[in-house]
């Protein structure tokens, strides 16, 4: 426990909280060609590469991902949720924060049913998370 005199000489330092999705905390001014510190809940981007990745040790699968160049010129890796997708190179996508625990370096999710990304077909439950329309009947 510090004495009052020690605290007067050197006050307590507050912990620096680091963002879990840093690319969403950067804006871009295209007129001045300079980055700004405007944060946003989602960002638009263009898929530069679409592929599959294998997860970390105890799991085994082929997880779908896309490398996305955002509107603030930062390039990130984003996960494509759901079964099947229509994304290819140059597709315009919307990304949100949210990591995938068993894929190292994947800190973002692509929003299904927004921009060029189609919703998951024949989805009955949790439809809003996958951009699926309400089934007829």
UniProtKB/Swiss-Prot annotation:
Statement: the UniProt record of this protein carries the keyword tRNA-binding: yes
Molecular function GO labels: rRNA binding; structural constituent of ribosome; tRNA binding
Region of interest (Disordered), ranges: 33-57
3-methylthioaspartic acid sites (modified residues): 102
HAMAP family, A to Z: Ribosomal_uS12_B
Family according to the record: Belongs to the universal ribosomal protein uS12 family.
Entry-linked PANTHER family: 30S RIBOSOMAL PROTEIN S12 FAMILY MEMBER
Listed name of the protein: Small ribosomal subunit protein uS12
Lineage: Bacteria, Bacillati, Bacillota, Bacilli, Lactobacillales
